[in-house]
């Protein structure tokens, strides 16, 4: 009975991680497209414009993934790691809005190296939320903290997520120190897209589930 349930979950997760990957690409396209349009309209270095393009480029998929998780819950689908991932991303997506706002109010140069953390949180706060939510899912499934930790560090999706969370801020800081400055909406979107490696964990999840299915 347990093996049958686990196989059913694997089928769901392969399909669901594939959907999450599509949502990420849609967010990229939306952010870059809106950035280009706002620049054409003359809204460079506009806080609201930058908020919109960073939200779409870094978190557009979170909105769609949150809707995906709600839809799956309402239809009574089997609870899965992909759904937990979607819920976590939706919850974490508002954090960078406040970080961006208070950074500007405090006079931080958001276009210099000092503001490297702003695109990081737009790109990664939902990923951090997804990582935490994924661990909670594993804990509930295992019913034991030490077993959940063991599952976490043997789960390729969770490990990829953790690696992305730790490496992205280093890349952003280096780029800013080398002279990159997001002075246009398109550049702001491009920087956020480059930092938004949230597609990697779903891709790993999809590939792993496909490999399991072929074995």
UniProtKB/Swiss-Prot annotation:
Keyword DNA damage attributed: no
Superkingdom of the organism of origin: Bacteria
Cellular location(s): Cell membrane
Topology versus the membrane: Multi-pass membrane protein
Residues spanning the membrane: 77-99, 117-139, 152-174, 189-208
Keyword Transmembrane: yes
GO CC terms in record: plasma membrane
Name of the protein described by the UniProt record: Uncharacterized protein aq_473
Species, as recorded: Aquifex aeolicus (strain VF5)
Lineage of the species this protein comes from: Bacteria, Pseudomonadati, Aquificota, Aquificia, Aquificales
């Amino acid at each position: 009975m347990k093996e049958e349930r686990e196989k059913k979950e694997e089928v769901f997760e392969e399909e669901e991680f594939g959907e999450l990957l599509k949502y990420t690409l849609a967010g990229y396209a939306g952010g870059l497209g809106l950035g280009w349009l706002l620049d054409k309209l003359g809204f460079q270095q506009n806080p609201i414009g930058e908020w919109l393009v960073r939200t779409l480029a870094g978190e557009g998929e979170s909105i769609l993934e949150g809707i995906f998780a709600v839809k799956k819950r309402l239809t009574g689908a089997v609870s899965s790691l992909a759904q937990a991932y979607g819920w976590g991303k939706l919850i974490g997506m508002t954090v960078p809005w406040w970080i961006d706002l208070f950074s500007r109010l405090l006079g931080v140069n958001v276009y210099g190296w000092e503001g490297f953390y702003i695109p990081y949180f737009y790109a990664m706060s939902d990923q951090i939320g997804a990582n935490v939510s994924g661990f909670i899912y594993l804990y509930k499934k295992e019913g034991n903290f030490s077993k959940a930790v063991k599952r976490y560090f043997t789960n390729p999706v969770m490990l990829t997520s953790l690696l992305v969370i730790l490496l992205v801020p280093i890349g952003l800081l280096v780029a800013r120190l080398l002279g990159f400055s997001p002075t246009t909406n398109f550049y702001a979107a491009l920087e956020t897209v480059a930092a938004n490696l949230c597609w990697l964990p779903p891709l790993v999840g999809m590939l792993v589930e496909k490999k399991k299915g072929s074995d």
